[in-house]
């Protein structure tokens, strides 16, 4: 988000979408995703966004699109029911992941007033991950269990052993902001005009 509006993040609202009914508004969000995905390709010169992380409501909107393909789960797989889970593929170009952790920050989820969010937050995080481990915005440098180094103590010449272990999560040297974009989705469940009961995705 530090990259700023238009580069690091943008907003989308169903009230301002170019659509007459729910399916057309869903397509408008999909069009916004494609535009921002291609802007990532222009910024990083590596490729367009190829994965999406979204809140449950945003994933529900994406799942209604005809381009969405469900991820097949075999019966013998031990699935993880919480956290971030892969839910499918959109248009053959985006792997879609659902983030259920964001919803846990709402006041209705058991948090007290000091730690609760004032309003529900919905978003679409677009990102690019290339074929190489370094071809991404954030790089996980893996944990090395133990490196052992033998040495001699300089004061008494007794044998010593040094142990070292480390890992790191670092930004790409050219900038992590070139690989990601957040679309903040506003006004889900709000009436388009005051005093009406008609809402989009309430």
Map each language-model feature to its residues.
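P-loop NTPase motor catalytic core
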Residues: 1
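Sequence/fold signature of self-assembling virion shell proteins
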Residues: 4, 11-39, 43-46, 50-51, ...
């Amino acid at each position: 988000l530090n990259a700023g509006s238009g580069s690091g993040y943008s907003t989308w609202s169903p009230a301002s979408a170019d659509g007459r009914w729910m399916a057309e508004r869903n397509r408008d969000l999909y069009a916004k995703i494609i535009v921002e995905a291609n802007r990532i390709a222009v910024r990083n010169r590596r490729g367009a966004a190829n994965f999406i992380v979204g809140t449950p409501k945003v994933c529900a909107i994406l799942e209604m699109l005809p381009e969405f393909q469900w991820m097949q789960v075999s019966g013998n797989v031990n699935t993880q029911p919480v956290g971030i889970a892969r839910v499918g593929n959109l248009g053959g170009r985006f792997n879609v992941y659902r983030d259920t952790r964001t919803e846990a920050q709402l006041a209705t989820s058991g948090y007290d007033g000091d730690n609760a969010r004032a309003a529900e937050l919905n978003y679409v995080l677009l990102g690019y991950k290339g074929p190489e481990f370094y071809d991404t915005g954030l790089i996980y440098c893996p944990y090395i269990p133990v490196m052992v180094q033998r040495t001699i103590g300089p004061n008494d010449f007794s044998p010593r052993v040094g142990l070292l272990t480390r890992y790191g999560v670092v930004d790409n040297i050219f900038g992590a902001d070139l690989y990601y974009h957040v679309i903040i989705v506003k006004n889900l469940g709000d009436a388009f005009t005051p005093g009406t009961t008609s809402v989009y995705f309430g």
